[in-house]
């Protein structure tokens, strides 16, 4: 029988902890730790002060809005599911609503949390919740000259293919699309949303 998460004791002991770098968005921590009473060893990790959020919008034709931008760190242009971040402790759904409006101009009447994913649990504390939004009310997005975005609408199943083929790059967006596709196939979605997705 598999152990439940609540039954598993923390095997890590922290011997010492040092903040090697600190900025408004994250800390880099260098700890000395022991696993299950073993030898002491160094462990470096990124401790986030902000979390990311993913807001997957579905319009009245069953299409997904994608946003595109040139990512400095990756040195490439990417298509992504809308999203952003906020300080830890703020309401993720409030953040998702704000990011959807900022990046697409849309407001949504209905929201459903799809999942919550760990980005890179071996080195980072970041957790990204993902939502699907429908019943969209369209408006002109307030473009930020410091963050130029391209936008395109694609049928839902085309977006799933893009996620599987690597054309959509952000991991939270890929996970949100695949989670929504699985829930659609299993009949585990509100009927109104399922009807929209089957239009595309």
Annotate each language-model stretch with its function.
Residues 46-47, 71, 175:
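A generic structural motif
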């Amino acid at each position: 029988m598999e152990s439940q998460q609540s039954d598993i004791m923390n095997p890590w002991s922290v011997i010492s902890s040092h903040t090697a770098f600190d900025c408004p968005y994250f800390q880099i921590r260098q700890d000395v730790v022991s696993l299950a009473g073993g030898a002491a060893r160094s462990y470096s990790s990124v401790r986030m002060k902000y979390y990311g959020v993913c807001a997957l919008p579905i319009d009245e034709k069953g299409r997904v809005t994608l946003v595109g931008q040139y990512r400095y760190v990756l040195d490439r242009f990417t298509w992504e599911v809308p999203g952003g971040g906020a300080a830890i402790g703020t309401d993720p759904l409030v953040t998702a609503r704000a990011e959807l409006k900022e990046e697409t101009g849309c407001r949504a009447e209905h929201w459903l949390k799809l999942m919550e994913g760990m980005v890179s649990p071996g080195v980072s504390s970041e957790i990204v919740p993902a939502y699907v939004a429908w019943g969209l009310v369209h408006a002109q997005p307030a473009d930020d000259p410091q963050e130029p975005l391209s936008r395109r609408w694609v049928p839902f199943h085309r977006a799933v293919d893009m996620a599987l083929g690597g054309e959509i790059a952000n991991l939270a967006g890929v996970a949100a699309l695949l989670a929504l596709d699985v829930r659609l196939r299993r009949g585990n979605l509100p009927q109104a949303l399922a009807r929209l997705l089957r239009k595309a």
